[in-house]
Amino acid sequence: MKRVADVLIVGSGVAGLYASLNLREDLEIIMVSKKSVNLCNSSLAQGGIAVARGKEDFQSFIEDTLKAGKYENNIDSVRVLVEESMDNINKLIDLGANFEKDENGVLFTKEGAHEINRIVYHKDITGKHVEDILLENVKRRKNIKIIEDCEMVDIYHRGNRCIGALFNKDGQDLSIYAKVVILATGGIGGLFKKSTNERIITGDSIGVAIRNNIEIKDLSYIQIHPTAFFSKKSEEKRFLISESVRGEGGKLLNCNGERFVDELLPRDIVSKKIYEEMKKTNSNNVFLDVSFMEKSFLQNRFPNIYNKCLEEGIDISKEPIPVAPAQHYFMGGIKVDLNGKTSMENLYAFGETSCTGVHGANRLASNSLLEALVFSRRGALEINSYIDNLELIIEERECEDLDKYRLLNRKILIDEICRLRGDIKDELVTCGGECKKSS
């Protein structure tokens, strides 16, 4: 089966959706989703979106981002992120986003390692709210076609020019050819036994990139979130207890009810302290306590967390939440420039799939959705400016072994992560004996 478009977008999270809305409406766009269109990590982002509160906040925001990233960030990317943050928040509001407000305007909350309150948010479901708003807008665009339940297994290229991609659609091969291809398939959390990510997020684009000699960067930079709800279900998605809970004053306690860390330190430091405390006390988890806060405040500020914990038998207004670290975010990915362009012509990568270098070795809280917005818009605007000069190339291809390539992509990525991070190899899932057959 074969289809054609001006632009092919692989992925339907915030990065992919926002890119499509910033592309010209006279362009034919196909967006492909691995499962249902709204099953993505973007919908799991709870805390909010960081934004510079005016030019006077630029340097502080830049410094907070650099400090969290161990000063291994790309400084040019950080400047772009910060200086273009408010423009993109305003565009989201124009599209229908409804961030929390009081009589003086938009409210800003604080999260770990931010010097000031600069996070806009929608209750404790900011990512889902933004995803829903963007998807509503996309569905109104007649030039955007969505294909669900369709997994990418390879890209097509002529020399160093990307011309399309190959997909597994219901066990059949689907070839989509386009002038420009955008990869926005998210991170690698589905490769870990304990992750806050959706299980389908398995680094598909990154495995494909490695196999096709596209430049990648910082694959060893994997973020562990300090506070995922502790469950004895060993290989299921872990429910995130947002950074904003600590930002509002939540306290981390050991099994003896003692505080042991400054809750607003960067994520990697808090996670390390929790691991040390768990080892010291021979415990599987620590506790995040908000029981001293008003019940009405908790229900209003964190309705999703409040109700989810109740489902697990925990009333957070009366007892602390059992938490433990879990894989959360991937700072590495496909190396891109300031417009999301990869080392292959006419191929872009946005969001967690990409590596802009903006996060350095450790992402600052609430910079993930912001990165997806800022750089996908920049890339879309660049595509708008030159796509009319590109030729659509269609090549006849023989039917591929879809399962072989799917498993090989995963094996290549897992092997590379294990090579770089032998310390976490036991935390990774395997793709079973089938991987050996595909190598």
UniProtKB/Swiss-Prot annotation:
EC number: 1.4.3.16
Keyword Cytoplasm: yes
Pathway(s) it belongs to: Cofactor biosynthesis; NAD(+) biosynthesis; iminoaspartate from L-aspartate (oxidase route): step 1/1
Gene Ontology cellular-component annotations: cytoplasm
UniProt entry keywords in alphabetical sequence: Cytoplasm, FAD, Flavoprotein, Nucleotide-binding, Oxidoreductase, Pyridine nucleotide biosynthesis
Cell compartment(s), UniProt: Cytoplasm
Taxonomic superkingdom: Bacteria
Example GO biological process: 'de novo' NAD biosynthetic process from L-aspartate
Cofactor(s) required for function per UniProt: FAD
Annotated FAD binding sites: 12-15, 34, 41-48, 204, 352, 368-369
Signal peptide span: none
Textual note on the cofactor: Binds 1 FAD per subunit.
Reaction equation(s) it catalyzes: L-aspartate + O2 = iminosuccinate + H2O2
Active site (catalytic residues): 267 (proton donor/acceptor)
UniProt xrefs under InterPro entries: FAD-dep_OxRdtase_2_FAD-bd, FAD/NAD-bd_sf, NadB, Succ_DH/fumarate_Rdtase_cat_sf
Site residues by UniProt (Important in orienting the L-aspartate substrate): 111
Molecular function GO labels: L-aspartate oxidase activity; nucleotide binding; steroid dehydrogenase activity, acting on the CH-CH group of donors
Entry-linked PANTHER family: L-ASPARTATE OXIDASE, L-ASPARTATE OXIDASE, CHLOROPLASTIC
Function: Catalyzes the oxidation of L-aspartate to iminoaspartate, the first step in the de novo biosynthesis of NAD(+).
Family membership noted in the UniProt record: Belongs to the FAD-dependent oxidoreductase 2 family. NadB subfamily.
Protein name: L-aspartate oxidase
Organism for this UniProt entry: Clostridium perfringens (strain 13 / Type A)
GN (gene name): nadB
